[in-house]
Amino acid sequence: MAQTLMATTRPYVLLSSTRASLYRLFQSSKRPFASFSAPLVRFTNSRCVSAVLSRKETAPSSIYGNRVSRVSGFGALDIRSLNFSTKSSQINDAGSIDQTLMQSMELKIKEQLNAESVTVTDMSGDGRHVCINVVSSAFEGQSAVNRQRMVYKAIWEELQNVVHAVDQMTTKTPSEV
């Protein structure tokens, strides 16, 4: 079982690890295992391993060489060899899909609740956070929680796909307006 780096009260502590991972970390086979004088490794509270240089050295090139490396639990890793990619989402710039989304939400609420007035406002600029104001006679005799449930039920499909959260919701009856 490989031993791991541990945080101690001393700032420059190198606890043992496997010889192969140290070799890969410092990229030098000429230095013996116990004689790392300049660069040391310490373990920080955020579970990141960072290189600590002695006072003589000014650049981390002796640690990483020309390669961009990061230390993982299994030794050093060349991060350029990893394939990073992102997946584009359905949401484009503000105003492209959002207006049709807001209008479809307003239409669904009006149809299902026979609402007199419905306003759906984009709060975040990308359609993920919305503010909803509804005036409907269907809210007569309903508690505030049940009124919100009725609105959520009407726009459930949008809440599952594009809309992340309803930041504010106002539900009133015509007599309360």
From Swiss-Prot:
Disulphide bond pairs: none
N-acetylserine modified-residue sites: S88
InterPro entries: BolA (IPR002634), BolA-like_sf (IPR036065)
Keywords: Acetylation, Chloroplast, Mitochondrion, Plastid, Transit peptide
Transit peptide limits: 1-87
Domain of life: Eukaryota
GO CC, any one term: chloroplast
Compartments (UniProt record): Plastid, Chloroplast; Mitochondrion
Membrane-spanning ranges: none
Family classification: Belongs to the bolA/yrbA family.
Described function: May act either alone or in interaction with glutaredoxin as a redox-regulated transcriptional regulator, or as a factor regulating Fe-S cluster biogenesis.
Assembly behavior: Interacts in vitro with GRXS14, GRXS15, GRXS16 and GRXS17, but not with GRXC5. Interacts in vivo only with GRXS14, GRXS15 and GRXS16.
UniProt protein name: Protein BOLA4, chloroplastic/mitochondrial
Native source species: Arabidopsis thaliana (Mouse-ear cress)
